[in-house]
UniProtKB/Swiss-Prot annotation:
<keyword id="KW-0963">Cytoplasm</keyword>
<dbReference type="InterPro" id="IPR018283">
    <property type="entry name" value="Ribosomal_eS8_CS"/>
</dbReference>
<dbReference type="InterPro" id="IPR042563">
    <property type="entry name" value="Ribosomal_protein_eS8_euk"/>
</dbReference>
<protein>
    <recommendedName>
        <fullName>Small ribosomal subunit protein eS8</fullName>
    </recommendedName>
</protein>
<dbReference type="GO" id="GO:0042274">
    <property type="term" value="P:ribosomal small subunit biogenesis"/>
</dbReference>
<dbReference type="GO" id="GO:0005730">
    <property type="term" value="C:nucleolus"/>
</dbReference>
<dbReference type="Pfam" id="PF01201">
    <property type="entry name" value="Ribosomal_S8e"/>
</dbReference>
<comment type="similarity">
    <text>Belongs to the eukaryotic ribosomal protein eS8 family.</text>
</comment>
<keyword id="KW-0449">Lipoprotein</keyword>
<dbReference type="GO" id="GO:0016020">
    <property type="term" value="C:membrane"/>
</dbReference>
<dbReference type="InterPro" id="IPR022309">
    <property type="entry name" value="Ribosomal_Se8/biogenesis_NSA2"/>
</dbReference>
<keyword id="KW-0472">Membrane</keyword>
<comment type="subunit">
    <text>Component of the small ribosomal subunit. Identified in a IGF2BP1-dependent mRNP granule complex containing untranslated mRNAs. Part of the small subunit (SSU) processome, composed of more than 70 proteins and the RNA chaperone small nucleolar RNA (snoRNA) U3.</text>
</comment>
<keyword id="KW-0539">Nucleus</keyword>
<comment type="function">
    <text>Component of the small ribosomal subunit. The ribosome is a large ribonucleoprotein complex responsible for the synthesis of proteins in the cell. Part of the small subunit (SSU) processome, first precursor of the small eukaryotic ribosomal subunit. During the assembly of the SSU processome in the nucleolus, many ribosome biogenesis factors, an RNA chaperone and ribosomal proteins associate with the nascent pre-rRNA and work in concert to generate RNA folding, modifications, rearrangements and cleavage as well as targeted degradation of pre-ribosomal RNA by the RNA exosome.</text>
</comment>
<dbReference type="InterPro" id="IPR001047">
    <property type="entry name" value="Ribosomal_eS8"/>
</dbReference>
<dbReference type="GO" id="GO:0032040">
    <property type="term" value="C:small-subunit processome"/>
</dbReference>
């Protein structure tokens, strides 16, 4: 007897029992949770109703995360799970689920920002640049190209909270996809009011 997602085994609202008028059906089984962890990619396919497929991610180590204010999406490494509004147990076991808050590697976003604006981001004062980074930031450009970069620099503003995270090399992000259903951990980088809210929550949790 498998587990099934049905409601005819429950009593009525009045308290009376229901007579089962059919057996358990193949279209109403309950399956074990994926409990996606951080690790080398491992995905199982599950055949579901209609011959369709679901992708159960058992382990994931990267995902596509978008930086909304800069309209930039990059594949980046998942480092750690830091907060989950629904269950602290899922933070302790580092389980990836939709809407959990995690730390992702900031390097792809920093590289994009520096190439796009020709400005350093999240660098410690007086830090040495590698020859490749030096070339990107201090490249000799034609007048027309230089003018384009000067125009871009006018809008290259980043909030102090994000700047601080770039210095640490880790960004707070939220998962928007469902890893146990589609086999991917994609999401967005936290910014603005949402970032402030979750920083407060994480700080309060650490203080306990």
């Amino acid at each position: 007897m498998g587990i099934s997602r049905d409601n005819w085994h429950k009593r009525r609202k009045t308290g009376g029992k229901r007579k089962p008028y059919h057996k358990k059906r193949k279209y109403e089984p309950g399956r074990p949770a994926a409990n996606t962890k951080i690790g080398p990619r491992r995905i199982h396919t599950v055949r579901v109703r209609g011959g369709n497929k679901k992708y159960r991610a058992l382990r994931l180590d990267a995902g596509n995360f978008s930086w909304g204010s800069e309209c930039c999406t990059r594949k980046t490494r998942i480092i750690d799970v830091v907060y989950n509004a629904s269950n602290n147990e899922l933070v302790r076991t580092k389980t990836l689920v939709k809407n959990c808050i995690l730390l992702v590697d900031s390097t792809p976003f920093r590289q994009w920002f520096e190439a796009h604006y020709a400005l350093p981001l999240g660098r410690k004062k007086g830090a040495k640049l590698t020859p490749e980074e030096e070339e990107i930031l201090n490249k000799k450009r034609s007048k027309k190209t230089q003018k384009k970069y000067e125009e871009r620099k006018k809008t290259a503003k980043i909030s102090p909270l994000l700047e601080e995270q770039f210095q640490q090399g880790k960004l707070l992000a939220c998962i928007a996809s469902r890893p146990g259903q589609c086999g991917r951990a994609d999401g967005y980088v936290l910014e603005g009011k949402e970032l402030e809210f979750y920083l407060r929550k994480i700080k309060a949790k650490k203080g306990k």
